[in-house]
Amino acid sequence: ICSPPRARFPLFTPPPPPSGRVAFYLFRNGEREQIKWYTQASEVEFELFQDGLYHAAAFIKYKEEQQPIIIHSRPIQVLHPAVPERIRNKTTISIFGSCVSRDLFELKQTDDFEIKCYIARQSIVSAVSSPITEPVRSILGSTAFDRRQVFNDIKKSTFSQLRDKTADYLLIDLVDERFPLVKYEGSLVTMSGGFQNSGLYVPSLPILKKQRLELENGGIEYNVDGKSLRDYVQSFCKEILSIFSQKQIILHRVRFTNYYQNREGQLCEFEPNVKSFNFSINQQLDYLYKCLQEFLPQSHMIDLSAGYYAVENHKWGLAAIHFQKEYYFAVLCALCDIVNLGYKAEH
């Protein structure tokens, strides 16, 4: 049996004076996990029991009556390599989501999966809004994929595509909820980069963001254009359940990370403005996934992103949801486990 790894976190703290004290906290995936109470030591060693992103913080009191000075270490990652299990049978899958789900199937280990339908750059609100019936003039875009996604978002053809291209499973991630919405031709569409470059967008179009409301009972709600976001999610789930059973639905819960690895291999934090956006969008995503689980209680959930970081040399560039390759292997392992579990239940 291997003992857990130990990590020493350099915090660059000068030794406190005789009357001073230092407390050390260990955080895993942003949550406090271990505490070393006030001591005169200037460094600390922790045992790391699980995979994840760790960092330590030192709370330094040079005088007992003073507020502590807080110093954070650089993060380190503990990770065991993931080895996907071969799935028992050829499996078809559709995606309502983003590149963070689609990129799984670029791995060599996914030969037994076939993608039937990929819907991207569409928010839940847009998907269940009224289709634009007027003829759409020529859509501009750098790629055919961009043009197809904008056309789908305008015509609201998501559910008909999913229905026509039958798949064994539907994989859902909500990364594209990061885009605001725009009022266009009497409907709501996703203000993705593709829409902004399509030739359809003009700056005078009203832009809508999800409004966070704190309720008297302490709960949280989001509204879009005066309507509860939860109602949009309920409508979305009703449409999805007319096509897939709950056991065919896999929720790929992704949170935006505050850490990335630069081209020199160093772990860094994103700039404060990026971290502020991450905090806001992660709050929205937590709410949305909670709603999805409310309406799809028997669906599967893959929730692994908290222990991983982004990489600057990602093929799509640096972004808080463009993860290290180990993340995609871990998600693929979880996906294969779900598929194999379903196969065993049927046989």
Each model region followed by its residue ranges:
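Short, compositionally biased P/S/T/A/G/V-rich stretches that sit at domain boundaries
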Residues: 1-8
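Substrate-gating cap/lid alpha-helix
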Residues: 259-303
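Catalytic nucleophile-elbow at a beta strand-turn-alpha helix junction centered on a G-D-S/GDSL motif
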Residues: 91-139, 143-147, 170, 175-179
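Conserved aromatic beta-strand anchor motif in extracellular beta-sandwich/beta-rich domains
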Residues: 24-28
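Short beta-strand segments within Ig-like beta-sandwich modules, predominantly Fibronectin type-III
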Residues: 34-40
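Surface-exposed cleft-lining segments at the edges of enzyme active sites
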Residues: 40, 143-145, 179-182, 196-234, ...
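Histidine-centered active-site loop/cap adjacent to the catalytic His
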Residues: 315-347
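Surface-exposed, short loops/turns at beta-strand junctions within beta-sandwich domains
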Residues: 46-53
